[in-house]
């Protein structure tokens, strides 16, 4: 049995002072890590082969709580994001995002809530939890939490990525 490696960490790998860093996702094909800063409305990406100096940050005009790959699409080009009011397709090259599906049909809920966290299930469905936004204060047990699911009907195909038909 091989010995256990240990490291002494004396400083942060990335010292970027997130307001609320969440949603880490490892992109195996490019050896990169992406994660969001919900409060500061940012998506951070770092190439683990190159180190902290490769950090790229994309600034949004809304909080983003989660990201997901799109089946059959290069994640360095496009991914899904759970944003303030719905699911968006993010064009990472153009740094533009387009609303794919709103979470709610009412303006009141759209204003009060934001995406929080989510994941792709084995059937390729993108599940996203929503909760009251930061400007409302601490989360309250007020019946404002919900879970949304987005999926495309692709027969019996199973994938850990969201199927997007464009």
Regions flagged by a language model, labelled:
Residues 32-34, 78-80, 125-127:
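Conserved beta-propeller blade signature
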Residues 142-153:
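Beta-propeller blade signature
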Residues 20, 63, 75, 114, ...:
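Beta-rich catalytic cores
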Residues 26-30, 70-76, 120-123:
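Residue-level detector of Asp-centered blade-edge/turn motifs that repeat once per structural unit
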Residues 10-42, 63-67:
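Beta-strand-rich domains and repeat architectures in extracellular enzymes and scaffolds
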């Amino acid at each position: 049995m091989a010995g256990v490696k240990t490291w002494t960490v004396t400083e942060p790998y990335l010292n970027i002072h997130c307001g609320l860093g969440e949603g880490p996702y490892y992109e195996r094909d490019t050896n990169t890590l992406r994660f969001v800063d919900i409060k500061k409305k940012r998506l951070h990406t770092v190439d683990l082969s190159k180190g902290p100096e490769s950090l790229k940050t994309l600034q949004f005009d809304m909080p983003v709580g989660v990201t997901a790959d799109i089946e059959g699409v290069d994640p360095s080009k496009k991914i899904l994001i759970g944003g303030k009011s719905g699911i968006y397709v993010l064009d990472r090259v153009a740094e533009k995002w387009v609303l794919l599906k709103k979470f709610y049909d009412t303006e009141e809920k759209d204003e009060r809530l934001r995406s929080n966290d989510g994941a792709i299930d084995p059937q390729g469905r993108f599940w996203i939890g929503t909760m009251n936004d930061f400007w409302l204060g601490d989360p309250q047990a007020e019946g404002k939490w919900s879970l949304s699911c987005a999926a495309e009907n692709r027969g019996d195909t199973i994938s850990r990525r969201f199927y997007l038909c464009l």
